[in-house]
């Protein structure tokens, strides 16, 4: 946003005028932070909380602890990162939660994208994840775009799960803890989704584009 950038520059000028821009003569200290590792641990915890919801149904304490730590044990989930940056989700998020990620493909980043376009809206990409799910007998297939801000999913039969259904499910999961919240989607959604979000869940549906 240009206004935000302009404001940052103004603040920098104000600080410089006050002398805040003078260099500290002390040697700088550099601290390495494994931000990606912290992010993956956060995602693991979000999934653990969402999947177990405080109850594992395990017969004893030890089994309950194991089930809580690895709530995806027994599930086979195939990830197709399309040689973008989403391979970490299989190796550092799903696998530590107990999921079998064998059969996941194109996890290594490669800017030439030699296998298919890293785009969950691309037909060839969707055919790739669908066929891999069927071939490996997976329970679920996940496919990401290059920078992992878009995804799609296919079921155990390789059928694409409608995006409206994914939004509806996610909204239903958060509606109790966040009543009246706003769900933002692009305009390519169905009237039925809006009716479900607003009339059934009591949420607001904001469409953009």
Each predicted region: which residue ranges?
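Gly/Ser/Thr-enriched, mixed-charge loops and adjacent short helices
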Residues: 1-136
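Proline/glycine-rich low-complexity loops and linkers
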Residues: 2-41, 45, 157-209
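Hydrophobic "anchor" residues on beta-strands that sit immediately upstream
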Residues: 76, 141, 182
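Active-site flanking residues adjacent to catalytic metal/cofactor-binding acidic residues
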Residues: 79-82, 144-146, 185
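Gly/Ser/Thr-rich loops at beta-strand to alpha-helix junctions
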Residues: 82-87, 148-149, 189-191
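Short acidic, glycine/serine/threonine-rich loops at helix termini
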Residues: 88-93, 114-117, 151-156, 193-199
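A structural signal for short coil/turn segments at secondary-structure junctions
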Residues: 97, 136-137, 178, 200
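Glycine-rich phosphate-binding loop
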Residues: 132-155, 160, 205-206
């Amino acid at each position: 946003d240009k206004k935000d950038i302009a404001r940052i520059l103004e603040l920098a000028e104000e600080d410089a005028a006050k002398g805040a821009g003078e260099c500290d003569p002390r040697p700088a200290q550099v601290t390495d932070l494994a931000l990606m590792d912290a992010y993956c641990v956060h995602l693991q915890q979000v999934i653990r909380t969402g999947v177990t919801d405080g109850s594992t149904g395990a017969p004893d304490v030890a089994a309950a602890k194991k089930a809580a730590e690895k709530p995806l044990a027994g599930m086979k989930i195939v990830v197709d990162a399309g040689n973008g940056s989403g391979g970490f989700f299989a190796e550092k998020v799903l696998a530590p939660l107990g999921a079998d990620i064998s059969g996941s493909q194109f996890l290594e980043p490669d800017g030439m994208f030699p296998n298919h376009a890293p785009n969950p809206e691309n037909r060839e990409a969707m055919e790739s994840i669908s066929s891999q799910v069927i071939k490996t007998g997976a329970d679920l297939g996940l496919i990401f775009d290059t920078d992992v801000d878009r995804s799609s999913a296919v079921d155990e039969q390789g059928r694409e799960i409608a995006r409206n259904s994914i939004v509806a499910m996610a909204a239903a999961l958060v509606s109790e803890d966040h009543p009246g919240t706003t769900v933002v989607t692009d305009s390519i959604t169905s009237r039925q989704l809006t009716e479900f979000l607003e009339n059934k869940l009591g949420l607001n549906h904001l469409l953009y584009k």
